[in-house]
């Protein structure tokens, strides 16, 4: 499927309404230079740019936002979680997933703690479950190569667009999701777009260039 520039960079109306708030929240959590760059101090009437910048640089900020979130997170995770996996308890790849949930060496507990931190900052975050699109002949080969589902945390400012469809029985399902996956050193943007049957990776050199579909894969999870 080909995409126009407008389609690739289009964002949901809720995204447009909230993206500035999300930027304020993460800069407030990071504090320091990030907060200064946000220029959240109110300007005085007739204040020159150099005077405003000097005032920004001279305004110390004790980062209570980060302290409160870290204290709350420590309280929530001070006791190890107890989980009942039910019928999944004998799943061969479960232990590998619990030990390395994101394929970056972080345990499931560590990923959930990070998700909780982001939820405290933004009000919510997204956990996307995906599986590498690698073909094997047998389940044994899949287990040997550790081909299994993994989790990715996506923060709200990177979830650009989505759509829910109502089924005949009245249930809503998510049938479209567009995520900004990466911005490269040259300013190009990689988008990952989920549909019920497929996942497309789209690249645009800039918001002035036509986007290109660089990969299409079956949606193995749905």
State each model region's role:
Residues 131-222:
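Structured, contiguous alpha/beta core segments that scaffold functional sites
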Residues 1-154:
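Extended, helix-rich architectural segments
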């Amino acid at each position: 499927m080909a995409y126009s520039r407008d389609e690739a960079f289009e964002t949901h109306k809720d995204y447009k309404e909230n993206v500035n708030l999300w930027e304020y929240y993460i800069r407030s959590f990071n504090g320091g230079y990030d907060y200064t760059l946000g220029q959240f101090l109110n300007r005085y009437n007739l204040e020159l740019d150099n005077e405003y910048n000097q005032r920004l640089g001279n305004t110390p900020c004790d980062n209570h936002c980060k302290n409160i979130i870290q204290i709350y997170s420590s309280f929530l995770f001070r006791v190890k979680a107890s989980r009942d996996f039910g019928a999944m308890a004998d799943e061969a790849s479960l232990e590998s997933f619990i030990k390395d949930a994101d394929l970056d060496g972080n345990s499931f507990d560590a990923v959930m703690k990070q998700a909780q931190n982001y939820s405290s900052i933004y009000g919510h975050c997204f956990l996307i479950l995906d599986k590498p699109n690698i073909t094997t002949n047998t389940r044994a080969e899949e287990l040997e190569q550790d081909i299994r589902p993994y989790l990715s945390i996506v923060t709200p400012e990177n979830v650009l667009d989505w759509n829910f469809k109502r089924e005949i029985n009245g249930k809503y399902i998510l049938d479209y999701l567009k995520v900004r996956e990466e911005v490269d050193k040259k300013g190009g943007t990689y988008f990952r777009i989920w549909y019920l049957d497929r996942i497309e990776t789209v690249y645009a050199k800039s918001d002035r260039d036509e986007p290109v579909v660089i990969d299409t894969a079956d949606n193995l999870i749905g």
